[in-house]
Amino acid sequence: MKVLGTSVPIFANDLESAIDRYEALTGETVTQRFELPERGIRIALLGSLTIIAGSATGLGVLKDVRATFLVDSLAEYEAHLRATGATVLQGPSQTPAGTNLIVRDLDGVVLEFVEVRG
């Protein structure tokens, strides 16, 4: 059970203008893009940022996520989180990046855990 990386979600009204702003701010460039067309969500990865655009309805609980942890075994993390009292809000679910799980911890913080494909 290991965290392989972390990401901070940035929610934007316009993905392209947000990408321009954050590329200028960080000096980084977008490395990947994903779409969830069934929910009207567009996502861009830029360094340790995940820029997300979509309607409040499409975003659902995702709009409340404060941090994303990339993990080696989502099943192990799910068991650990449940055992320590976290509430599963969504998932495990398949996404373009892999499988994710969204939980609320005991402090009320909403966190996403993702086991990346490949």
Identify the function of each model-found stretch.
Residues 29-64, 110-116:
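Conserved short beta-strand elements that form part of the metal-binding/catalytic scaffold
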Residues 1-3, 10, 31, 84-118:
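Vicinal oxygen chelate
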Residues 43, 68, 100-102:
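Short hydrophobic/aromatic beta-strand element in the GNAT-like acyltransferase core
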Residues 66-81:
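Mid-chain, well-packed structural core segment of small domains
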Residues 18-23, 81, 108:
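Conserved active-site tyrosine of GNAT-family acetyltransferases
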Residues 1-19, 65-67, 117:
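N-terminal beta-strand motif that seeds the catalytic metal site of vicinal oxygen chelate
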